[in-house]
Amino acid sequence: MSLLHVHHVGHRYRTGGLLRKRGWLQVLDGIDLQLHAGESIGLLGSSGSGKSTLARLLLGLEKPAQGQVSFAGQDVSQLKGEQARAFQRTVQLVFQDAPGAFNPQRSIGWSIAEPLRHLTDMDEAARQARTLALLEEMGLRAEHAQRLPQQLSGGQLQRANIARALAASPQLVVLDEALSNLDRLLQLQILQQLEALRQRSGTAFVLISHDLSLVQYFCQRVVLLHGGRIVEERPVTHDLCFAHPVGRQLQAAVLPVRPQRRPSPQGLPTAAH
């Protein structure tokens, strides 16, 4: 049985207002998708393709207008009480906006431990040990736990944001453009750390991005969204080639995953840039 099953899901939003005619905007239509435990898939598409809306449906933040999202065989929209609490512990979302995920008046350590206070029975000592271990796992130091969000760089804050998502040992983590504001080297470092976690613990990942190079670096399978529909799905291989025009456009715009050396005017290699 798949860990996550999206069955013929559609979603729409109200449009219009006081001075405009009301109507509906269909943002997702006929989405079918499965994810297995320990798998990493990429949701690839340009802005407005429906990626972030699908992420919200996967985590039960919104109920689909049509179809069903099931996690471990249970309809996500029907979970209540202890079942809902268990689901919140099992599935985590990381947004692009790291500053918005933290209370500016609370320390980084306090924020990372927040899911542990609400979703687990850990005592204070265990929470502190888990927080420090997560910081180290994400390439941060123990002293960062005492700092306020505004005292960290953007890259450090996003790593702390991911550490917070991993705190309660979820089975699934959805990264919604979570690496978009980071430089390429830091993106790769974080993905290497998450890949090690995936292999070690069997955590599944959904990487939502418009950057094909990151999807190719991290994911086992790629799903291409366009106009609210899945238009192509392929395993990630070194010779990945899309048939759909949107996929080919994204492929043409791809940046190299690693910095490339270029020849100097004298034909000698120069340092990577």
Swiss-Prot record:
GO molecular function, one term: nickel cation binding
Function: Part of the ABC transporter complex NikABCDE involved in nickel import. Responsible for energy coupling to the transport system.
Source organism of the structure: Pseudomonas putida (strain ATCC 47054 / DSM 6125 / CFBP 8728 / NCIMB 11950 / KT2440)
Protein keywords: ATP-binding, Cell inner membrane, Cell membrane, Ion transport, Membrane, Nickel, Nickel transport, Nucleotide-binding, Translocase, Transport
Membrane association type: Peripheral membrane protein
Lineage, highest ranks first: Bacteria, Pseudomonadati, Pseudomonadota, Gammaproteobacteria, Pseudomonadales
Subcellular compartments: Cell inner membrane
Keyword Cell inner membrane carried by entry: yes
Top EC category: translocase
EC number: 7.2.2.11
GO cellular component, one term: plasma membrane
UniProt-recorded name of the protein: Nickel import ATP-binding protein NikE
SMART domains in UniProt: AAA
Gene: nikE
